[in-house]
């Protein structure tokens, strides 16, 4: 498979999970060259090791992911093995959206088929990548889904606006570390761009974590030893200066630092078709 002009060429394989196949047969009917056939599960169970290896060891190739239709299919789907009906179009759309935005995605899901296969009791077809990032999903049975989704969008926007204000205050602190200020400014500069903001958000979290002084670290500084003793007597664990206080508060909401992609999923329920 050629990634594109001036990019790499890769070997491509399709590994099937015998334990997760839903048995619907849609893939067999859709294959244009009759390359697939349905067989008894028992004889294919040894192939589970192949599937597990591919999931665990094969990494995404970034130069295959150029947001074209072809390129999107080499990204990890974060919707898998749902209990939807055979050939369900809803899951095809939802899977594609997770391939494009799944690692920074919020979903407000209307009640209907899309909430039944999307959030059945005790399980979820939505998954995470190796970094533990994936879609955050929510459904409200008795609330209009447009309002529910708008509320999620507005709420996280307000939290991020507050984080931006705190970040500007942090940059203004005279003694804040230069590397922390640089990371903070890089985050501010990209905070409204979902693609560009991903790496600056990670770097900002790392810089925040490294910038906070503990009381024990303060005690090792002769000029701050007395203040450290006062903090220790109060049971404090961290420095209470403006920079450390702001950094700790920003870190308490770090899941909102990365720009999110907000989606409202409908379905037959929202369309008044059930």
Where are these regions (language model features)?
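Iron-sulfur cluster-binding cysteine motifs and their immediate structural context
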Residues: 1-2, 9, 13, 17, ...
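N-terminal leader/propeptide and maturation segments of large enzyme subunits in energy/redox metabolism
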Residues: 141-171, 175-180
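N-terminal amphipathic, basic-rich helices that act as targeting or association modules
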Residues: 71, 79-111, 115-121
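Mobile "lid/hinge" segments at catalytic clefts and subdomain interfaces of large enzymes
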Residues: 119-157
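Short acidic, glycine/serine/threonine-rich loops at helix termini
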Residues: 26, 47-51, 118-123, 128, ...
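Amphipathic alpha-helical binding modules
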Residues: 222-249
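Thiamine diphosphate
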Residues: 91-96, 106, 116-120, 182, ...
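Gly-rich Lys/Arg/Thr-decorated short loops/hinges at beta-loop-alpha junctions or inter-strand turns
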Residues: 3-13, 69-80, 143, 182, ...
